[in-house]
């Protein structure tokens, strides 16, 4: 049995699986300005490998997937049925964390922060 954390959530109606290539649009938590870039998500065994390229900087992360079963949110190994992905990432000396949820229109919406920041920023992934 996989390790899982359970939370009560609403059901999601779109097709699952965060694997793919996406256009990224987000908000910088420090300046409030908008940024754009790309992100690629692939499965790497039981985890996800997530690589962002934004404004000439590469961020590399490892993620866990999540599904809804019996009205409960279960976090565990990467799976094509995942409707959410939780990611820890690094770039040089910078580290951070992020969480994204599949939307009905096929986009992935989430929030992220980085080590030491008191702020949270929003980001949307658009399938390419």
Question: Which residues does each PLM region occupy?
Answer:
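Central antiparallel beta-sheet cores of small beta-barrel/beta-sandwich binding domains
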Residues: 17-128
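Cleavable N-terminal signal peptides
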Residues: 2-4, 14
